[in-house]
């Protein structure tokens, strides 16, 4: 009887653990403007409108796919990879933010 109770307690714990991942709340939307200022802004000044350690990003001729891959995978010796810091959807939002930059307007979150 004691073994049965121990097994039931362990089984209950395993079931609760298995379903715990499914009950996580949705990720909070990324504040792209603040993220860009605090992380990307070190190398891409004025929200990417001015070249610094990194290139100017506003009006870039690079494709969205190129920008996505560069943000996600980086470039050894030139840019850190941020694929482990952001989800793919968040990286897409960063690319949208860059695409919407205007020289004379305050940047907006996508």
Give the label of every model feature segment.
Residues 1-4:
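Positively charged n-region of N-terminal signal peptides that target proteins for export
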Residues 6-13:
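Bacterial N-terminal signal peptides
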Residues 14-35, 108-109:
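Electrostatic cytochrome c docking/interface patches
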Residues 26, 61, 85-86:
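Short, conserved sequence motifs enriched in acidic/basic residues, glycine, and aromatics
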Residues 29-33, 42-78:
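Gly/Gly-Pro-rich "capping" loops immediately C-terminal to redox-active cysteine motifs
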Residues 35, 74, 85, 89:
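Residue-level signal for short amphipathic helical patches enriched in basic/charged
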Residues 38:
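Cys/His-enriched microdomains
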Residues 84-110:
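C-terminal capping alpha-helices of c-type cytochrome domains
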């Amino acid at each position: 009887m004691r073994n049965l109770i121990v097994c039931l307690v362990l089984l209950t714990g395993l079931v609760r653990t298995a379903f715990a991942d499914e009950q996580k709340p949705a990720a909070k939307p990324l504040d792209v403007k603040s993220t860009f200022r605090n992380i990307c802004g070190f190398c891409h000044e004025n929200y990417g409108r001015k070249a610094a350690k990194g290139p100017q990003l506003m009006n870039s001729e690079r494709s969205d796919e190129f920008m996505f891959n560069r943000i996600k995978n980086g470039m050894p010796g030139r840019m850190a990879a941020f694929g482990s810091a952001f989800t793919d959807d968040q990286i897409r939002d960063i690319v949208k933010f860059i695409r919407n930059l205007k020289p004379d307007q305050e940047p907006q979150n996508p």
